[in-house]
Amino acid sequence: NLVTGSPAADGVTALFALDATVTLQGPSHERSVPVTSFYSGYRTTVRRPDELVVRVSFELPKPGAAQTWRKVGTRKAQSISKAALAAVAETEEGVITRVGFGAASVAEVVLPLASVRSLVLGKNVHSLNMNDVEEAVDSEIRPIDDVRSTGRYRRHLMKVLVKRFLQALA
């Protein structure tokens, strides 16, 4: 799932939310790449033909961190997502101190929703402006129409999934 570069890679969303690092090894070298930089385009990665993925690493969230993984599909199992979101957040006294997102099936690659992260990091969960959150999601995703869903519905889903996660922090 990680190396195929699929924009619908549900499991990869968690790696994005956790800010994972992918370690690649070739015949005479080893290098590490943030998972958010691992994908170079639709179904393409920065992995060279002579490299293997040998490790995926990430820092575990602190105990009590909020975490979610949501997949919306036509069926309950074995369905390619209309949209999927993984999110992790740590708070201290209501202030978001760490947050990460991974969004699938809303662009040509899995997205970290960096604009949403920048918007909410360091903010009090009770003072988040959900209209601003929606605008940040809207500005970053690029969903398409295909046999599974419309781009319009995917856009709506991602806004709802992100807002529900952030509202649950309060």
Model regions and ranges:
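C-terminal structural segment of proteins
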Residues: 1-170
